[in-house]
Amino acid sequence: MRELRVAVLIIAVSLPSFSASDRQGDALYDMKQKLNVTGNQLSDWNQNQVNPCTWNSVICDNNNNVIQVTLAARGFAGVLSPRIGELKYLTVLSLAGNRISGGIPEQFGNLSSLTSLDLEDNLLVGEIPASLGQLSKLQLLILSDNNFNGSIPDSLAKISSLTDIRLAYNNLSGQIPGPLFQVARYNFSGNHLNCGTNFPHSCSTNMSYQSGSHSSKIGIVLGTVGGVIGLLIVAALFLFCKGRRKSHLREVFVDVAGEDDRRIAFGQLKRFAWRELQIATDNFSERNVLGQGGFGKVYKGVLPDGTKIAVKRLTDYESPGGEAAFLREVELISVAVHRNLLKLIGFCTTQTERLLVYPFMQNLSVAYRLRDFKPGEPVLNWPERKRVAIGTARGLEYLHEHCNPKIIHRDVKAANVLLDEDFEPVVGDFGLAKLVDVQKTSVTTQVRGTMGHIAPEYLSTGKSSERTDVFGYGIMLLELVTGQRAIDFSRLEEEDDVLLLDHVKKLQREGQLGSIVDRNLNQNYDDEEVEMMIQIALLCTQSSPEDRPSMSEVVRMLEGEGLAERWEEWQQVEVTRRQEYERMQRRFDWGEDSVYNQEAIELSGGR
C-alpha cells in the first residue's frame, strides 16, 4: 500500500510537467501551421508528440519548458500565431529573414521571460503593439526591415532591461520616446521620426548609435559625425546592386572606442568580435573544418543563441587599402541578395585576420552530394540536379547582369554551390570575387580558381569576364550529369581523357553519352533532359569566350528556349573546326615525316 501511495505521488508531481509540455507543443504546432511551413521543413513538429523538446530548432530547460525557438531564414511566408504568447518560459525567439506578413499579435506581451525578440527582415505590417512594453526582461528587440507604421509605443521606454533596440527601415512616424536614446545601442534609421531635443542632429541623418563603456557626449557627437561622413563617402563611391527591396542609404554603425572589440552592424551585416567567432568554432578546431578553398578554410560554428554558422577564415588576403578597402568590398558584396546566392551575414577584422560569416548549409555542397556522401545518405536525384542547374544559373545571372558593378565569381564549380535544407542551390564563395566595371574586364596577377574549371583565356592571360564564369558553369553541368570530377587521373587507366570536358566531347562524337551518366542515378533520369544538359554544357565551354552564351541565355535554354538553334549552329562550327584540325594534322604528319626523311638522307650521305 505504501508503494502505491508513492507511485501515485510521483504521477501527481509529473502530470503538471507533461501537461505544460503538451500545451507548449500545441502552441508551437499552431505556430507552424500559421507560418505555412511547406515541404520537409519542421517535419518533426508533430502534434501527436507530447514533448516538443525533441523538435528541431526548439531548446528546453531541465523542466521541459520551451526556452528558445530559432527559425531564422527559413523562407516562411505565413503569419505569427497569437498562441506564441502562451510560451511563458520562452527567452529567445528568432524569426528573422523570412517572408512573414501580418502584424505582431498583442499576445506577445505575455512572454514574460523573453529576453530576445528578432523579427528583422520580414514583411510585417501594422503598429508595434504597446503590449511589448510588458516584457520586463527584454534586452534585445530587432524589428528592422519590415513595414511597421504608426509611432513607437511609449511603453517600450519603460523596459529598463533593454540594451539593444533596432527599428530601422520601417514606416514609423512621430516622436522617439526620450528614454530610448539612453539604450546602449539603438537604430531608428530609414523612418519618418521626430527626434525632438534628444539627439544632437536632425532625424534626417543616420539615426544609429552604439555606446562605448566610457564614452562621453563628445564621443557621441564625433562618432555620429564620423558615421555620417563615412556613409556619404560610401554612397558617393559605389552604386548598389539593383533590385534591392529598399533603395535608401544603408545604416552604418561606428565602433566607439571601448575596452572590448564588440559587435557592430554594417548595414544588415553584423561585425563580430574575434572572441565570438573563436568561441563559436571551438578555437577554430580542425574537427569543425567544413572545407578548404582558394581563399582559406571554412569552419562550422554555433552562436550562443544556437544559430549555426560557417566562418571563412581568409588566408593570404591582401587589400591595398587595408581594412577600409576590405569593408567597402564586404559592403558591396552584402547587397548582392538573391535566393540562389549565399547571403553574407557578418564579418570580423583584426590587425592580422579577415573572416566572413555565412549561414550554415546543412546539406553541404553539391560536390559532397555527388561524390563524397557517406553510406546511407541520400544522393542527388535527377530532379534535384535540374534544380541545381537552373538555380545556379539564375544566381550567376544576377551577379553578372543585375549588380553594378557586376561581380565575377571566378571559381564556379559543384563544390562552391551549397544546398539549403530544401536542397535549393545557393552559390557561395563569391565573397571575394573581383568587382569589375560594366565596360571592363578584370585583370589579375594571380589566377583564382580550380584546375579543370578555369577557362583557357583566364589561365593564359589572367583576364576574367562573365564568360569565364560561363565556362566554369558548363563544367559544373558535366559534374551534375556524370558525378565525376573535372580532373581525374584515374581515367588514364582506361585510356580516357584526364579532363572531364575532353572525355565528354569524345563520347559525344562517338554517340556514347549514355555511358557517362552517373551510375548513382540508377537510370532514373530522362534521356532527352540529359542530352539537353550536355548540349548546354558544351556550348558554355567553347574555347572562345565570345562564342559562349551569357548566363541569361543559359537560363532561357534551360527553360526550353533557343537551345535547338544554338546547338545546330555549334555542330556546324564544330564539324568545320574538326575537319580543319584533321587537315592540319595530316599536313603536320606529312611534314614531320619529310623532315625525318631529309635528315636520314643527309646522314646517309658522304662525309
Curated annotation (Swiss-Prot):
Residues 22-219 are extracellular. It is an enzyme of class 2 (transferase). CDD domains: TM_EGFR-like (cd12087). The active site is at residue 411. Its main location: membrane. It is found in: Cell membrane. It catalyses: L-seryl-[protein] + ATP = O-phospho-L-seryl-[protein] + ADP + H(+); L-threonyl-[protein] + ATP = O-phospho-L-threonyl-[protein] + ADP + H(+). It comes from the Eukaryota. Residues 284-563 form the Protein kinase domain. It holds the Pfam family LRR_1. Residues 1-21 form the signal peptide. May be involved in the regulation of plant growth through the brassinosteroid (BR) signaling pathway. This is LRR receptor kinase SERK2.
